[in-house]
Structure formats: structure tokens, C-alpha cells
Amino acid sequence: MSKVLEQVEAIVAPITDELQLELVDIAFEKEGPNWFLRIFIDKDGGVDIDECAAVSEKVSEKMDENDPITQNYFLEVSSPGAERPLKKEQDFENAVSKYVHVTSYEPIDGRKMWEGTLVSYDGTTLVITITDKTRKITCEIPKDKVAKARLAIQF
């Protein structure tokens, strides 16, 4: 995480804690000519539009006082959606037995992408069962080789 995002997280985390919400992720992304600060929040049962608006309002007030981002941007607050990113240890633990999409920094056994059921996670290794054509394969992926991981929707 960049230094700017760490500073933003230091501003946002107390707000989400106060509102009893989970801070899932923060992203600062450019789309076309515009920059977007995206804050993803959640709670058991999901968040509603009023909770997103409350976080947006409080974050906007705090950022106006001392904004670590120097350029203009749009602030967006939303739920992470069905394909929630897996970033924290707890995210991976909660995803055991769920369908996930994982990419790695470098090939592992000839693959850089897996989509299947997360069978287990021990803090260092993800064990995923995938279907390759007609057979099931169990793959072990070291956590430190994971570039991105998220929940996935199985079709």
C-alpha cells in the first residue's frame, strides 16, 4: 500500500470503526482524465446506501481538514460487492469453502490464474480445488506469491 493510501486509511479507519463497519479496501485510481478515491465498506448482512452516505460525509469532512491527496478526485464509498477482494488474513479465513479467483505474480506449476473452491488456508498457503476440463485438481499457492485474490461467482 502506498504512503498516501496509508494516510487515507488512517483517516478512514476510525470513521468506519465508529460506525461499526468493516473497512474492506481503499483504492486510488485514474479513469480517463479523472481520479477516484474508492472506499469499500461492509458488515454482516451488507451495507445500505445510508451507511455509504454517512461514511462519505464523514470522510469528506476529515479529508477537507488535512487531505494527503494533492490532486482533485471524486470520492466514492460502496460495498465490495459479490466479488469482494481478499486482502486481510481474516478475509482468506472467511473464504474457506467459497469459490475464489486468484492470480499470482509468477507462474506456479505453469499457471498464473486459478478459479475454484478455497479448500483451506493456513496463513501461508492457499489450497484451491479447480476443475481443469473434466478433472478436479488441488493446487497449493503460497500466500506471498498471490498478486490478487477475490471471491468469485461460479457459473
Swiss-Prot record:
Query: InterPro entries under this entry?
Result: Ribosome_maturation_RimP, RimP_C, RimP_C_sf, RimP_N, RimP_N_sf
Quick check: keyword Cytoplasm in the entry? yes
* Entry keywords, A to Z: Cytoplasm, Ribosome biogenesis
The cellular location(s) given in this protein's UniProt record come to: Cytoplasm
Pfam families in alphabetical order: DUF150_C (PF17384), RimP_N (PF02576)
Superkingdom of origin: Bacteria
Its Gene Ontology biological processes? ribosomal small subunit assembly; translation
Q: Does the keyword Transferase apply?
A: no
Sorted alphabetically, the Gene Ontology cellular component annotations on this record are:
cytosol
**Summary of the function given for this chain in its UniProt record:** Required for maturation of 30S ribosomal subunits.
The record's family statement is: Belongs to the RimP family.
HAMAP family (alphabetical): RimP
What protein name applies here? Ribosome maturation factor RimP
- Which gene codes for it? rimP
